[in-house]
Amino acid sequence: MSENVMTLQVITPAGVVYDHHANYITARTTNGEIGILPNMISTIAGLEIDELKVRRPDDETHVDYIAVNGGIIEIKDSLVTIVADSAERNRDIDVSRAERAKIRAEKALEVAKAEKKSDEIKRVEVALHRALNRLNVSSHN
Amino acid sequence: MGASLNEIKTKIASTKKTSQITGAMQMVSAAKLQKAESHAKAFQTYAEKVRKITTDLVSSDNEPAKNPMMIKREVKKTGYLVITSDRGLVGGYNSNILKSVISNIRKRHTNESEYTILALGGTGADFFKARNVKVSYVLRGLSDQPTFEEVRAIVTEAVEEYQAEEFDELYVCYNHHVNSLVSEARMEKMLPISFDEKGDEKASLVTFELEPDRETILNQLLPQYAESMIYGSIVDAKTAEHAAGMTAMRTATDNAHSVINDLTIQYNRARQASITQEITEIVAGASAL
């Protein structure tokens, strides 16, 4: 293994979603976007619902996108671990399902706003955010 | 000889049908067990990682914990999350866990106000209701391969009740799946979260850069940790349930077969007896002439 490579593992309750080498990763933490390079200082941070961009070492143009629903990122000894409730690679995303989830969330948001339930609004907004994120990531195909 | 030929015949036919059904149910449970086992395995990796990150984070400095989920409060009330099945036909699965919960509760508490039950699965909920034990939360109709989303409702409920100081510690009671023949009733303390038991693991010497800060990450990570622990026990319990169902149905099928054997012998004897009787009657009739 060359020195300038790190391993990225994305793990969800349904199993390991992604386990590959990478030489550059961008992720959005609660504090903002970070770029991760091999041999970086050990870090733990919370993630936003957003996309993860992974540059693979085999080819300059080889980039993977992963939709991550929150979770935690841990960087330690060039091993990047992400544990999240759910995560999907762009090629695994079911676009029509994500589309339906988006429409459902939009409708639920209208209802919740009409009824002025602030908890419900927050919850639905997160669901909508997730659906939009999945759609956004799947568009990289 | 009691029963007539016809009666025995119907009995044999009906037992055969029952054995077919139990045989089919055994196969269904076996298939579900296999699925549940692979699911539990996939989840194991997740649980390990969450645990590792939490340990890394907590052991990276020695300040006393400030997070409400880690602070030990004086125990005034204990919550028990009891995982049972919704359906019957799983052998001793339910009675096993309920018996151990009841005996534990009797040992620990003298007063009813000292504990509360959260029931997952209909059998447990009905059991405690019939005994006038207060059940503060019931979740029924969990699917055979519960997803994380499905279980989140009860986990969130448990964590919220804990944070609202409805109870001061939470135990999860479930059947741990050992193998397809053996499961054992377990009672595990989930809240407050403690890392005392991992004394043999060496604390990592790596210091971590924390973004944004320790408390914020803990606030996000600890609920996830608790969720994963509780979800893990639910997955484990479901696996044990399928195993118990499989074993129970196999025993039922075996029993049905032995009943059919006995009945067939009885039937043949009765048939033989009636033939003998007929011959005797004919012979007696002939000699009377």
UniProtKB/Swiss-Prot annotation, chain A:
UniProt subcellular location: Cell membrane
Name of the protein in its database record: ATP synthase epsilon chain
GO cellular component assignments: plasma membrane; proton-transporting ATP synthase complex
Subunit structure of this chain's protein: F-type ATPases have 2 components, CF(1) - the catalytic core - and CF(0) - the membrane proton channel. CF(1) has five subunits: alpha(3), beta(3), gamma(1), delta(1), epsilon(1). CF(0) has three main subunits: a, b and c.
Summary of the function given for this chain in its UniProt record: Produces ATP from ADP in the presence of a proton gradient across the membrane.
Gene name per UniProt: atpC
Keyword Membrane belongs to the record: yes
CDD domains: F1-ATPase_delta
UniProt feature coiled coil, ranges: none
GO molecular function term, any single one: ATP binding
Similarity comment: Belongs to the ATPase epsilon chain family.
Organism listed in the record: Lactococcus lactis subsp. cremoris (strain SK11)
Curated annotation (Swiss-Prot), chain B:
Example of a GO cellular component annotation carried by this entry: plasma membrane
UniProt xrefs under PROSITE patterns: ATPASE_GAMMA
Biological processes annotated in GO: proton motive force-driven plasma membrane ATP synthesis
Keyword Membrane set for record: yes
One example GO MF annotation: proton-transporting ATP synthase activity, rotational mechanism
Major subcellular location class: membrane
Alphabetical UniProt keywords: ATP synthesis, Cell membrane, CF(1), Hydrogen ion transport, Ion transport, Membrane, Transport
Matching Pfam families: ATP-synt
NCBIfam families referenced in this protein's UniProt entry, alphabetically: ATPsyn_F1gamma (TIGR01146), PRK05621.2-1 (NF004147)
Function, as annotated: Produces ATP from ADP in the presence of a proton gradient across the membrane. The gamma chain is believed to be important in regulating ATPase activity and the flow of protons through the CF(0) complex.
Subunit composition and interactions: F-type ATPases have 2 components, CF(1) - the catalytic core - and CF(0) - the membrane proton channel. CF(1) has five subunits: alpha(3), beta(3), gamma(1), delta(1), epsilon(1). CF(0) has three main subunits: a, b and c.
Protein name: ATP synthase gamma chain
Species for this entry: Lactococcus lactis subsp. cremoris (strain SK11)
The gene coding this protein: atpG
